[in-house]
Amino acid sequence: MAKRKQNVRSKRKVKKNIESGIVHIRSTFNNTIVTITDMQGNAISWATAGNMGFKGSRKSTPFAAQLASETAAKTAMDNGMRTVEVNVKGPGAGREAAIRALQAIGLEVTAIRDVTPVPHNGCRPPKRRRV
């Protein structure tokens, strides 16, 4: 009989010691997504308003964005992160609340960039909603 090969995979996440990183905040009209990466762009932690338990129109509130930002920041701080740059994208309500939550939890924000994509008259937008 042939021996079975056992693949041993660790279930625990490896803690990295990363001093500084980038916080990407994508704030849409329906949700807020917070991703924290190292300087090369490798994701360390992430959180969304929907992931925090909010559903429907409550996902788009500033409070939901604040909770998502705090959760992602706590995980990043466990990995040794102290200073961050913030890239904000989108027109949503949770933009400022997410940045304030990062500062309140103890991360030092060195730069805030608005990287919202603006078309130079590219694609035709969808037709207007009539309710």
Swiss-Prot record:
Part of the 30S ribosomal subunit. Interacts with proteins S7 and S18. Binds to IF-3. PANTHER family: 40S RIBOSOMAL PROTEIN S14/30S RIBOSOMAL PROTEIN S11. Keywords: Ribonucleoprotein, Ribosomal protein, RNA-binding, rRNA-binding. Disulfide bonds: none annotated. GO terms for cellular component: ribonucleoprotein complex; ribosome. GO terms for biological process: translation. Located on the platform of the 30S subunit, it bridges several disparate RNA helices of the 16S rRNA. Forms part of the Shine-Dalgarno cleft in the 70S ribosome. Transmembrane segments: none annotated. Gene3D superfamilies: Ribosomal protein S11. GO terms for molecular function: rRNA binding; structural constituent of ribosome. It comes from Exiguobacterium sibiricum (strain DSM 17290 / CCUG 55495 / CIP 109462 / JCM 13490 / 255-15). This is Small ribosomal subunit protein uS11. Belongs to the universal ribosomal protein uS11 family.
